Each structure stands twice: as structure tokens, then as C-alpha cells.
Amino acid sequence: MAVPKRKTSPSRRGMRRSADALKQPTYVEDKDSGELRRPHHLDLKTGMYRGRQILKPKTAEV
């Protein structure tokens, strides 16, 4: 069975666990529509990304 040679200090343990925290996602306001969206992601309502039409905008089906 593997046994550690040295005791892990609280500082080293905390540095190891520092990457485990959940971070709140960031949002930016879209220049064209004014809606909030994730940075470097396309706007799902309009289908635009960096001024280009990537996806067809969704139309309301009756």
C-alpha cells in the first residue's frame, strides 16, 4: 500500500485544492441585440458570431 513519506502542509494542500473551486461564468452584453451571452460564443437567438451569420435564426413555428 502506498504511504506518503512526508506530511502535506496545509499550504500545499490548499494550493492543490485551489483549482477545484466553481467559478461563476462571465457574460458580456451583445453589441447588436443587447442580450447577455458568453464571451467567444455565438448568439443563439440571432445566430451571429463576430459579425457573421453562422446559424439560421430560429423562427417561431405555429
Swiss-Prot record:
Coiled coil: none annotated. The keyword Ribonucleoprotein applies. Residues 1-16 have a biased composition (Basic residues). Residues 28-44 have a biased composition (Basic and acidic residues). GO terms for molecular function: structural constituent of ribosome. It comes from the Bacteria. GO terms for cellular component: large ribosomal subunit. InterPro entries: Ribosomal_bL32, Ribosomal_bL32_bact, Ribosomal_zn-bd. It holds the Pfam family Ribosomal_L32p. Keywords: Ribonucleoprotein, Ribosomal protein. GO terms for biological process: translation. Residues 1-62 are annotated as: Disordered. The keyword Electron transport does not apply. Belongs to the bacterial ribosomal protein bL32 family. This is Large ribosomal subunit protein bL32. It comes from Azorhizobium caulinodans (strain ATCC 43989 / DSM 5975 / JCM 20966 / LMG 6465 / NBRC 14845 / NCIMB 13405 / ORS 571).
